[in-house]
Amino acid sequence: MRIVSVKQGVAPISSAIANAYIDFSKMTASIVAVTVEGPGGRRATGYGFNSNGRYAQPGLLAERFVPRLTEATEAEITGADGGLDPAGAWAAMMRNEKPGGHGERSVAVGVLDMALWDAAAKLEGVPLWRLLADRYNGGQADEAAWVYAAGGYYYPGKGVDQLVEEMKRYLGMGYSTVKMKIGGAPGTALKQALAEDLARIEAVLKLLGGDGSRLCVDVNGRFGLHAALTYAAALRPMNLRWYEEPLDPLDYSTHATLAEHYGPPIATGENLFSMLDARNLIRHGGLRADRDVLQFDPALSYGLVEYLRTLQMLVEHGWSPRRCVPHGGHQFALNIAVGLGLGGNESYPEVFAPFGGFADDVPVADSRVRMPDIPGIGFEAKNALYAVLKTLD
């Protein structure tokens, strides 16, 4: 195997939406195309991009990680079976990188890792979910993945009525579980935000027939302990599907305190970018393996190579892969969920286009989606996204 070329670019995903911590007015994403050549001159091009919430990384890609990948020897990136070995390529990209400090570096590596897995599956002529099931899950792949519609962002002029209409659209698309932002738009005082959020939540619950198990709420890490506990007391009677990222992701001891006082499920992890950070959360965050949800995003956390290490760590600590529901809302994580038996995957039906969402002709029914039989990740079956990725060719 050899790397023929690596091309990169930056795509805008800017929007006027906001969560409790940031707005997305200047958000960007890196896109890459990695062409590899196998035995007999057979070639495949894999594509990658980073999930929303972290910006494009053209500098890190150009200065460190693309050169290392293109300089990798054939032996380094060829597996024992003669196919492309993403783990070997990952090791080449991370050569001479010190441990720790997993912020933006993990995003750059994750973008390339996604493309390498796409290419690896294409060379095998199989969907990525099938390749993963065969290599790492005893050949067992789920027939469908549970997915939920993430939205409910703050937006100028968007009131409760507009929020309910948005959620109604998601239900019409086949989603039975939805997620909305809470914690107030950036700059909103928390005391004001709580009153507004309770009205917003109650309106959505009414739409859902009062069934809290169909609603997730997401703080995006804005709260300290006092605010997290105040919201927890108000949310507890609602029996929500989960209370997401109420605290700074690295504040493990405060997570443990919250878990002592809030019995229903807590979800977190999307902003932890390595197996070691994930392990610290499991060791010190007080999370409960029978109910809490882990949202590590393989596209942001050094890619699937590192995510496989995270899954192994979880098993060693008594956690099932079914407790993992990755952040990101894209086809890469969906393939991983189906192939490795995770608990589901996020979806963005109306935001972060064209990167969010799944293949064009794949319907969602009762918050479940089946996988198309397309080699690789399946970007070619999502026309708007494929058009962006093809600009690199």
Question: What would you call each of these model-derived segments?
Answer:
Residues 32, 43, 112, 125, ...:
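Conserved, mostly hydrophobic/aromatic
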Residues 104-107, 113-156:
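Glycine-rich, aromatic-flanked loop segments that form ligand/cofactor-binding clefts
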Residues 37-40, 44-124:
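Metal- or metallocofactor-binding catalytic centers and their adjacent structured scaffolds
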